[in-house]
Amino acid sequence: MAQKINPLGFRLGVTQNDRSHWFAQQRNYSKDLREDQKIRTCIENYVRTHIKSSSNYGGIARVEIRRKIDLIQVKIYIGFPNLLLIEGRGQGIEKLRNDVLNMLDSADRKLHIAIEKVAKPYRKPNILAEYIALQLEKRVPFRKTMKKAIELAEREEVEGIQIQIAGRLDGKEIARVEWDRGGRVPLQTIRARIDYCYYPVQTIYGVLGIKIWILEE
């Protein structure tokens, strides 16, 4: 029988890299791990609440965290950076930094946040998943949404993409799984540069789960 495994963890060290870079003693490891999750959640909530791009969604591709003795370095890869989030313009970065520090409840630690724009945002599954979630919240038909997302990814010259949506699609009483694919997506090959994300979205019919696999060149 098939064994389910996260595609990113399956390829870690081969075609995928860690998104947190730090070392901790055993007694502090779980604490730092929870802090990383809180930092990512705080950043995502801030972007969704305060930053409205032309597409009406944040467009965060990933968040990388590096830790030193008294310094936390956070690098946000974003597809559609608002002027308030670009370094040197406005107070967006400073307000975000203060929000994260208040959440960590640690006044003696330094935090540095950097923003990097993603050249081709629709090659990133997290950004595509946000786009699909926005369309589903607006009650756009899920098949139309999947086909449009595949078109956006193919314009960015991805080699292959697979999208799966599960839940009460179109408000039907029985939940089901629907998927669509463009190009090739060899999930069983470790050497294939597969990027993946899972994104839940709350609709009036319940929670839908979105999974996206993208084969990069």
UniProtKB/Swiss-Prot annotation:
Residues 47-119 form the KH type-2 domain. One of its GO terms (biological process) is translation. It comes from the Eukaryota. Disulfide bonds: none annotated. Keywords: Chloroplast, Plastid, Ribonucleoprotein, Ribosomal protein, RNA-binding, rRNA-binding. GO terms for cellular component: chloroplast; cytosolic small ribosomal subunit. It is found in: Plastid, Chloroplast. InterPro entries: KH_dom-like_a/b (IPR015946), KH_dom_type_2 (IPR004044), KH_sf_prok-type (IPR009019), Ribosomal_S3_C_sf (IPR036419), Ribosomal_uS3_bac-typ (IPR005704), Ribosomal_uS3_C (IPR001351), Ribosomal_uS3_CS (IPR018280). Part of the 30S ribosomal subunit. HAMAP family: Ribosomal_uS3_B. Belongs to the universal ribosomal protein uS3 family. This is Small ribosomal subunit protein uS3c. It comes from Pinus koraiensis (Korean pine). The gene is rps3.
